[in-house]
From Swiss-Prot:
Cofactor: Mg(2+)
EC number(s) reported in the record: 2.7.8.7
Subcellular location: Cytoplasm
Principal localisation: cytoplasm
One Pfam family from the record: ACPS
Lineage, top ranks: Bacteria, Pseudomonadati, Pseudomonadota, Gammaproteobacteria, Enterobacterales
Family, per entry: Belongs to the P-Pant transferase superfamily. AcpS family.
Organism superkingdom: Bacteria
Protein name: Holo-[acyl-carrier-protein] synthase
Keyword DNA-binding found: no
Example GO molecular function: holo-[acyl-carrier-protein] synthase activity
Function: Transfers the 4'-phosphopantetheine moiety from coenzyme A to a Ser of acyl-carrier-protein.
Top EC class of this enzyme: transferase
GO biological process, one term: fatty acid biosynthetic process
């Protein structure tokens, strides 16, 4: 296995909160998959949940070498947790096709949040 890409992103939680205050759930609708949306709607800390998902998806797009552009969209990345709570990532659509073309066989995700920030790192391996 070889590392094909590495991406990191940090999000100021207050900025996400300000966007939600200004435009309602528009950002969440753009960023979250249907499954993530159903969790977000009932989450005790929806702003923090959205900030962490945003950070993971930005980091994943960077790890794939493109960022969110060229046909990639936030909702093509889905963050979920395994049975132990470890964050994992599913890819859909163009993001999945790009990963297949790159020869990605494993995706590693780590995320953290503190009072003011959410941070994520994603490594893609062959």
């Amino acid at each position: 296995m070889a590392i094909l890409g590495l991406g990191t992103d940090i999000v100021e939680i207050a900025r996400i909160e300000a966007v939600i205050a200004r435009s309602g759930d528009r950002l969440a609708r753009r960023v979250l998959s249907d499954h993530e949306w159903s969790i977000w709607e009932q989450h005790q800390q929806p702003v923090r949940f959205l900030a962490k998902r945003f950070a993971v998806k930005e980091a994943a797009a960077k790890a794939l070498g493109t960022g969110i552009r060229n046909g990639l969209a936030f909702n093509q990345f889905e963050v979920y947790n395994d049975e132990l709570g470890k964050p994992k990532l599913r890819l859909w659509g163009e993001a999945n096709l790009l990963a297949e073309r790159m020869g990605v066989s494993a995706i590693h995700v780590t995320l953290a949040d503190e009072r003011h920030y959410a941070c994520a790192t994603v490594i893609v391996e062959s």
